[in-house]
């Protein structure tokens, strides 16, 4: 349910950013703001304090961010405060990034390996995934020693598990079934 609302807010911010040709700036600045909301104790105290009114919170946000971020992005933050949706900022950022990828015909492929892929392996994997999904592939590489060997790829909800760990677990299940 909240994902739907997050997407609506994200789409509104995306459209404003695109219209003003500041989309990348909005994504980067909003990402930093989300990081602050999660990690800055002072901002957390202000946002979560029940005795600080919404109008006071808005004034504080104006003092913190005015002149440091685009005015339309600041207005977006103030709207989130007013609608009591500031706690959804991380979900909105996630949806904003998804929308940006969709609009630019890109998709993120999470790739887990024991050792980093070579440039040749990345190129080969990117071309195969690009052909399958008909999108530009952006790699999110993760080094994971627990997979023992092979490669694990996740694109959206699709998983391609060619890891030794998976093969060993599959063999174990087959062997235990036969007993």
From Swiss-Prot:
Provenance organism: Clostridium acetobutylicum (strain ATCC 824 / DSM 792 / JCM 1419 / IAM 19013 / LMG 5710 / NBRC 13948 / NRRL B-527 / VKM B-1787 / 2291 / W)
Subcellular location(s) of the protein: Cell membrane
PANTHER family per the UniProt record, alphabetical: ATP SYNTHASE DELTA CHAIN
Listed GO MF terms: proton-transporting ATP synthase activity, rotational mechanism
Gene3D superfamilies the record matches: N-terminal domain of the delta subunit of the F1F0-ATP synthase (1.10.520.20)
Membrane topology: Peripheral membrane protein
Gene giving rise to this polypeptide: atpH
Function: F(1)F(0) ATP synthase produces ATP from ADP in the presence of a proton or sodium gradient. F-type ATPases consist of two structural domains, F(1) containing the extramembraneous catalytic core and F(0) containing the membrane proton channel, linked together by a central stalk and a peripheral stalk. During catalysis, ATP synthesis in the catalytic domain of F(1) is coupled via a rotary mechanism of the central stalk subunits to proton translocation. This protein is part of the stalk that links CF(0) to CF(1). It either transmits conformational changes from CF(0) to CF(1) or is implicated in proton conduction.
Chief site of localization: membrane
Keyword Transferase applies: no
Protein's UniProt name: ATP synthase subunit delta
Record keywords, A-Z: ATP synthesis, Cell membrane, CF(1), Hydrogen ion transport, Ion transport, Membrane, Transport
Assembly description: F-type ATPases have 2 components, F(1) - the catalytic core - and F(0) - the membrane proton channel. F(1) has five subunits: alpha(3), beta(3), gamma(1), delta(1), epsilon(1). F(0) has three main subunits: a(1), b(2) and c(10-14). The alpha and beta chains form an alternating ring which encloses part of the gamma chain. F(1) is attached to F(0) by a central stalk formed by the gamma and epsilon chains, while a peripheral stalk is formed by the delta and b chains.
Similarity annotation: Belongs to the ATPase delta chain family.
InterPro entries noted in UniProt: ATP_synth_OSCP/delta_N_sf, ATPase_OSCP/d_CS, ATPase_OSCP/dsu
GO cellular component terms listed in the entry, alphabetical order: plasma membrane; proton-transporting ATP synthase complex
């Amino acid at each position: 349910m909240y994902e739907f609302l997050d997407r609506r807010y994200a789409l509104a911010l995306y459209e404003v950013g695109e219209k003003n040709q500041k989309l990348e700036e909005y994504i980067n600045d909003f990402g930093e703001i989300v990081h602050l909301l999660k990690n800055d104790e002072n901002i957390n105290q202000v946002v979560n304090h029940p005795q600080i009114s919404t109008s006071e919170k808005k004034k504080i946000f104006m003092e913190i961010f005015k002149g440091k971020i685009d005015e339309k992005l600041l207005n977006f933050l103030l709207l989130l405060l007013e609608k009591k949706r500031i706690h959804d900022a991380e979900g909105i950022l996630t949806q904003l990034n998804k929308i940006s990828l969709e609009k630019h015909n890109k998709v993120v492929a999470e790739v887990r390996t024991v050792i980093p892929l070579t440039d040749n392996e990345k190129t080969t994997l990117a071309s195969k995934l690009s052909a399958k999904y008909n999108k530009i592939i952006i790699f999110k590489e993760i080094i994971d020693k627990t997979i023992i060997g092979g490669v694990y790829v996740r694109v959206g909800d699709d998983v391609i598990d060619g890891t030794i760990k998976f093969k060993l677990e599959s063999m174990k299940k087959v062997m235990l079934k036969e007993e």
